[in-house]
Amino acid sequence: MKKILLFTVIFLYAKADEICIGYLSNNSTDKVDTIIESNVTVTSSVELVETEHTGSFCSINGKQPISLGDCSFAGWILGNPMCDDLIGKTSWSYIVENQS
């Protein structure tokens, strides 16, 4: 009897670390692709991208952000000559990319 009880407890603990993903049903027709699934119906959303800005950026832990200005992130990484003034930047808290 003790062996059965021990086996049951071990089995339940082994299954306890699984993550179950559920979906709340509503009348939404919006579909998105997630990391693990395609065409998942959107049930609720929160806008995380800021649409307005005051023009000033905060430093984090004493490090200033790097503003790419008219340069794109890809252009900075690939060495676009328009991004030459960013070459000497070796440390920053986050990257600010302006919309073009």
From Swiss-Prot:
Please state where this protein is localized: Virion membrane; Host apical cell membrane
The domain of life for this entry's organism is: Viruses
**Alphabetized GO MF terms:** host cell surface receptor binding
Where do glycans attach? N26, N27, N39
Write down a Pfam family by its short name. Answer: Hemagglutinin
Post-translational note? In natural infection, inactive HA is matured into HA1 and HA2 outside the cell by one or more trypsin-like, arginine-specific endoprotease secreted by the bronchial epithelial cells. One identified protease that may be involved in this process is secreted in lungs by club cells. Palmitoylated.
Which Gene3D superfamilies does the record cross-reference, listed alphabetically?
A: 3.90.209.20, Hemagglutinin Chain A, Domain 2 (2.10.77.10)
Q: Keywords assigned by UniProt?
A: Clathrin- and caveolin-independent endocytosis of virus by host, Clathrin-mediated endocytosis of virus by host, Disulfide bond, Fusion of virus membrane with host endosomal membrane, Fusion of virus membrane with host membrane, Glycoprotein, Hemagglutinin, Host cell membrane, Host membrane, Host-virus interaction, Lipoprotein, Membrane, Palmitate, Signal, Transmembrane, Viral attachment to host cell, Viral envelope protein, Viral penetration into host cytoplasm, Virion, Virus endocytosis by host, Virus entry into host cell
Q: Give the membrane topology.
A: Single-pass type I membrane protein
Report the GO terms under cellular component. host cell plasma membrane; membrane; viral envelope; virion membrane
Position of the signal peptide: 1-16
InterPro entries from the entry? Answer: Capsid_hemagglutn, Hemagglutn_HA1_a/b_dom_sf, Hemagglutn_influenz_A, Hemagglutn_influenz_A/B
Protein family? Belongs to the influenza viruses hemagglutinin family.
Q: What else is known?
A: Major glycoprotein, comprises over 80% of the envelope proteins present in virus particle.
- Stated role: Binds to sialic acid-containing receptors on the cell surface, bringing about the attachment of the virus particle to the cell. This attachment induces virion internalization of about two third of the virus particles through clathrin-dependent endocytosis and about one third through a clathrin- and caveolin-independent pathway. Plays a major role in the determination of host range restriction and virulence. Class I viral fusion protein.
How does the annotation summarize its subunit structure? Homotrimer of disulfide-linked HA1-HA2.
Q: What is this protein called?
A: Hemagglutinin
Q: Tell me the organism.
A: Influenza A virus (strain A/Duck/New York/12/1978 H11N6)
Q: Which gene encodes it?
A: HA
